């Protein structure tokens, strides 16, 4: 109710930083085709407890795995952005990098390139939105309509 999580921990430390930021990058290793459970708990609490407008803050997610599960985890993380009116920064491939042991991801040339392109695109998108906000303002928000499927 007050824009803070009832559990007074790192989530309440992140919230004011997120409010001031133009974008948010979230990264996770892949466990059973899913993001790290602690990260998901933080994101659930952060996005649920904060009441500031997240519209047009740019989101980006990055995953790291030995082999599979990256695209499912990528989708899981991006859902926080898309339900919050946040555009998602693109790259030339899904934002993942591969490695099994510590330090191995440095050998994933395609993954590193994908993340470099992501960084450039995210920077460009945040700058473009800032210029658009100055010149045109943000899109007009509609009053939320909620549909209940059980009547």
Question: Regions from the language model: what does each represent?
Answer:
Residues 1, 78, 107-109:
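Short, hinge-like loop/turn segments at secondary-structure boundaries
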């Amino acid at each position: 109710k007050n824009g803070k999580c009832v559990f007074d921990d790192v989530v309440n430390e992140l919230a004011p930083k997120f409010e001031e930021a133009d974008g948010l990058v979230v990264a996770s290793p892949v466990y059973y085709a899913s993001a790290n459970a602690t990260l998901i708990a933080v994101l659930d609490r952060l996005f649920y407890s904060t009441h500031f407008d997240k519209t047009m803050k740019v989101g980006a997610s990055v995953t790291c795995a030995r082999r599979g599960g990256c695209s499912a985890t990528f989708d899981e993380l991006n859902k926080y952005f898309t339900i919050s009116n946040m555009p998602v920064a693109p790259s030339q491939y899904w934002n993942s990098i591969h490695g099994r042991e510590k330090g191995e991801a440095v050998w994933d040339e395609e993954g590193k390139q994908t993340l470099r392109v992501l960084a450039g695109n995210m920077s460009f998108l945040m700058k473009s939105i800032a210029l658009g906000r100055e010149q045109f303002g943000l899109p007009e928000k509609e009053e939320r309509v909620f549909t209940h499927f059980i009547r």
